[in-house]
Amino acid sequence: MLTDTEGIVLRQIKTSYNRRMILLFSKKYGKISAGTSIQEKGRGKSSLALRPFTYGRYELFKNRDSYNINSADVIKSYYAIGENVDKYMNGAYVLEFTERVLSEGVPAPGIFHLLLDFFDLLESRDRGIGTLVLGYQIKLFKYAGVAPQVDRCVHCGEKKEAYKFSIPEGGILCQECWEKMQNQQDKTEQKSFCTENSQQHTLIYDPEFGIVNILKYFTINSLKNLKNLALKEDTGRLLQKLIRE
């Protein structure tokens, strides 16, 4: 069956017989792998549309469980990203991060447009690139349904002041729930030494440095509203650490 879709190239892999496998984030079908015989070194529109950091339109032959790219046209090439090392490294990281989050064959139009917004901003931005990446990641979590809960306690569900931010629990804890957890943990550790609890303890943070407000701001506002925002380096590093954990 012949079909077409807009898409963003995540990466490409060379295979045998001068063919390549393109990992494509398509608007219509989500993340798909599609083979193609279009030559990489060509200067035609189809060849240019198969490179990473490219937003294009792709004509596909869709089999029951596979895709082949017959032709492609560039809608927009973010070639300027590749001319700056910092932009390129951050852009490549975002493509890899997005690839890990996406499920195979599941359309994700919200994330698709979010990624395009990110590239538009990255191409024109000269400072605070790390802040832009963090904003993208936090909003991506929201679209994927795994964003941390920051408007109410993850245990009791009440809108109380944040006392701790817990990665294992997935959001903020009020003081009452935190103290209950501590008491329960103390009783458990009196019976047996538990290294798992000790390791989880290192994934709980005080919210004093503004993490809750930052997460709320990034979640509520569009990515384009972050274009002039740049976090302090230590705050950015801590947020990146939280995301990776």
What residue ranges belong to the model's regions?
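Non-catalytic alpha-helical scaffolds and adjoining flexible linkers that form interface surfaces
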Residues: M1-M21, F25-E245
